[in-house]
């Protein structure tokens, strides 16, 4: 399901944005009890889509993406995938860390492949997948599209002073 992604707004008009936003908010309210609290909170917190707020991922730049499989069990045979994305925030005063736990599937299309990177994070939607998991769709300014289906998403804002020691 898509409401506010670019493909849903062919004219990129204010009216399309308002209509899509209203439908997206209604959708999120309808799945509130089915999404994990942190995914729902991230999708509905006011600053997420307030592009003047420094914590918003909009216009952030990808600095790193890690895919790992933490293991447990006697032979490390119990595995699950997780993805961690580290963004340089749009106002260059902090970083955003997104942790996707219990990843079931993902597609990380890069878009333009001229060596110039992903560009800026444009729009994203959090929804419920057909399998009842969290689905996060992220559009990038150079045409990339990420689809990550997971158990949950954790968001952390790291002010630049703190970020220097986290790297």
Language model segments and positions:
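Surface-exposed, interaction-prone regions used to assemble/regulate multi-protein complexes
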Residues: 1-167
